[in-house]
Every structure is written in C-alpha cells, then in structure tokens.
Design a protein with these regions (language model features):
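Short, surface-exposed polybasic-aromatic patches that bind anionic ligands, especially phosphate groups
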Residues: 1-174
Length: 174
C-alpha cells in the first residue's frame, strides 16, 4: 500500500499506535489537514497549472516558470510535485511571496559538507549532524547548491529548536 511507504519515513513500525474509541477522539478539536513540511515538496492541485514551493506553516510560493523551478530545484524538479486535494489546498495553505532566485524559508541547502536552513533571507548553518537530526530533518530533502553567497549569515543551529523541529500551523488572516 502506498500509505505504508509514507508511514515508513515517520516511524520504524506501528507498535506504539494506540487504538481509541471515536467518542474519545471526539474530545479533541479537529486540527485540520496537515500541510507538507517546508522544503520537502512542491505542490499543485487539479484545478491549476501552477506549482508552488511549501514554506513554514503551509505558506505557498509560486514558481512562475519551469526555468525558475529548474534553477532552484534542479533538472528533475517535477519529481518533487505532489497533488493536493483542492479543498485541502485552499483551506490548509496560505499565500506567500512568489519565487525567482531565492529559496523560501524552511528550505535545506547543502554546499559540500555544510548544511543550511533558509530563514528570512539568511542561511543558518547546522553546527553538526546532531543539530540537523535533532530537528527531525531528512537528508533526502537537502538541495545541493554551489554557494549561498546571495544569503546573509544567520545564527548557527546547534540543537533542537521548536520552530524548526515541529509542525507550525499557518497564521490565520482573520
């Protein structure tokens, strides 16, 4: 089953899953649909030809051309694209700035052995692989680039940071 492949990257197995009654589940608020984690996928939906990069909190950053997508995400950028159900798309994601030559917040970049987290126009270097791992990042989501000269130098990531390690819901515009 396809869902088993998705589950495999989260947990080694399902041994710690606890079954609960629907009545118990109903005691909790519905948190809505989960967005893709920033920097891991590009998204679209059936009612548009637009492709978006996902930033923190489900912010969407339109890639206006295939050339921009290729320049940022490589020649096989299209393998990162995931279809999102249109209803989830409009209710779970929020608009962000369009992309041209800079990566959105939440993108993981790699120059040689150095790894960086993009944040507000800066790149934050990871002090070591332990700092990377502590924030639940996946090495498969690193984008190899020649340099990060266009970015400012941010504070080093030295360990777990709540804003990096966990899901951060989008801010409501209400």
């Amino acid at each position: 089953h396809e869902w088993m492949d998705v589950g495999a990257w989260v947990y080694e197995n399902f041994d710690d899953v606890v079954r609960v009654d629907v009545a118990e589940l109903d005691m909790y608020d519905d948190g809505g649909a989960m967005t893709y984690r920033a920097g891991t996928k590009l998204v679209t939906h059936a009612n548009t030809a637009k492709i978006y990069a996902v930033g923190p909190g489900g912010s969407l950053h339109w890639l206006p051309t295939a050339e921009v997508a290729e320049a940022l995400y490589g020649a096989t950028w299209y393998v990162m694209v995931q279809d999102v159900i249109p209803g989830y798309f409009s209710s779970s994601y929020v608009s962000g700035a369009d992309l041209s030559d800079m990566y959105p917040n939440g993108t993981l970049l790699q120059v040689g052995e150095e790894m960086y987290y993009v944040m507000d126009g800066d790149v934050r270097p990871f002090a070591d692989s332990d700092a990377f791992d502590a924030n639940n990042f996946d090495y498969d989501n690193l984008i190899e680039v020649d340099d990060v000269d266009a970015y400012g130098a941010g504070e080093s990531v030295t360990g777990e940071e709540t804003g990096l390690a966990g899901f951060m819901p989008a801010e409501s515009s209400d």
